[in-house]
């Protein structure tokens, strides 16, 4: 009888342990698969594509690739002598038309004072018309001078903000055209994370929720806050024909891949450029508050580790 009881007890204990283990593993698996997290996340930053507003030879490059620069710092200079001469020519035109306008103003004033008693109305009108023409030419010359001055100022390319010069593509002696991108500037203190969450996990993502960011290849966990969720994404299976009618591609009904939606996460602390824009990370949205690691069970900790490997 005692032997039977011991066998039954061992069997019952084994069954209970198996059930408990199954429940624990099942909960860990559900937490791993359904909680709001993704390994498809990228560090991003505000990037300014710097292009000159004038064309010409590059006469001086003042920075090197990946250098941290301050707002207003000179990056490179374009052919100033040419634009200086253009400004001097425009200034000479302004001076000429100013003198000519003064002469025509005096002539028109003299004829208007003499009146029709001394000359015909046609001669008076002609003097007034010549004056107006010269004044218009003076205004045009002044506008040309102002543009020449602006072009000269813009031969010096300056940093529009504090940040890092990257992908520097200009060298002294090269000819650069107006509007062609010469360098990119990654703004300092503008880093954030874009986490591409599956649509099935968006229920647990809200603006203001806390998030943990683990850069790929690092054990350091950064903290952040969900800033916003994208309002829409492109439907790759839907296009329009030449009449504007929707064209929907056929999908396999038994295979439905979850669409990924960008979620923008604001970092609590800027990390400078330790993790450059474009590098990857794992993101876990923990809810309204940060996760208390001391309260995590063994299986939950295992689920967190699983996220790093798939």
Curated annotation (Swiss-Prot):
UniProt keyword annotations, A-Z: Cell inner membrane, Cell membrane, Membrane, Transmembrane, Transmembrane helix, Transport
Membrane topology (UniProt): Single-pass membrane protein
GO CC terms of this entry: plasma membrane
Disulfide bonds: none
Upregulation: Positively coregulated with aaeB and aaeX by AaeR.
GO molecular function, one term: transmembrane transporter activity
Transmembrane segments: 12-32
Gene3D superfamilies cross-referenced by the UniProt entry: 2.40.30.170, 2.40.50.100
Main location as per UniProt: membrane
Subcellular location: Cell inner membrane
Protein family membership: Belongs to the membrane fusion protein (MFP) (TC 8.A.1) family.
Function: Forms an efflux pump with AaeB.
NCBIfam families associated with the record: PRK10559.1, RND_mfp
Name the record gives this protein: p-hydroxybenzoic acid efflux pump subunit AaeA
């Amino acid at each position: 009888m005692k032997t039977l009881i011991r066998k039954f007890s061992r069997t019952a204990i084994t069954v209970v342990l198996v059930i408990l283990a199954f429940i624990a593993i099942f909960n860990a698996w559900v937490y791993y698969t359904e909680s709001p997290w993704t390994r498809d996340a990228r560090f991003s930053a505000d990037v300014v594509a710097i292009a000159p507003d004038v064309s010409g030879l590059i006469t001086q490059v003042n920075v090197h690739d990946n250098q941290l620069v301050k707002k207003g710092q000179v990056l490179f200079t374009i052919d100033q002598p040419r634009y200086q001469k253009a400004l001097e020519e425009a200034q000479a035109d302004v001076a000429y038309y100013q003198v000519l306008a003064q002469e025509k103003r005096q002539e028109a004033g003299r004829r208007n004072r003499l009146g029709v008693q001394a000359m015909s109305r046609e001669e008076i009108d002609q003097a007034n018309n010549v004056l107006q023409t010269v004044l218009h030419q003076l205004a045009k010359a002044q506008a040309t001078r102002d543009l020449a001055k602006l072009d000269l100022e813009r031969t010096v390319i300056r940093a529009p903000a504090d940040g890092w010069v990257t992908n520097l593509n200009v060298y002294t002696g090269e000819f650069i055209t107006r509007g062609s991108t010469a360098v990119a500037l990654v703004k300092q203190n503008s880093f954030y994370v874009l986490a591409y969450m599956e649509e099935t996990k968006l229920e647990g993502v809200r603006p203001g929720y806390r998030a943990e960011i683990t850069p790929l290849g690092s054990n350091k966990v950064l903290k952040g806050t969900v800033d916003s969720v994208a309002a829409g994404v492109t439907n790759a299976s839907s296009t329009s024909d030449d009449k504007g009618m929707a064209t929907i591609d056929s999908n396999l009904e038994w295979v439905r891949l979850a669409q990924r939606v960008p979620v923008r996460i604001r970092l609590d602390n800027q990390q400078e450029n330790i993790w450059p824009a474009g590098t990857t990370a794992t993101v876990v949205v923990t809810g309204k508050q940060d996760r208390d690691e001391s309260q995590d069970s063994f299986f939950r900790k295992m689920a967190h580790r699983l996220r790093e490997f798939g």
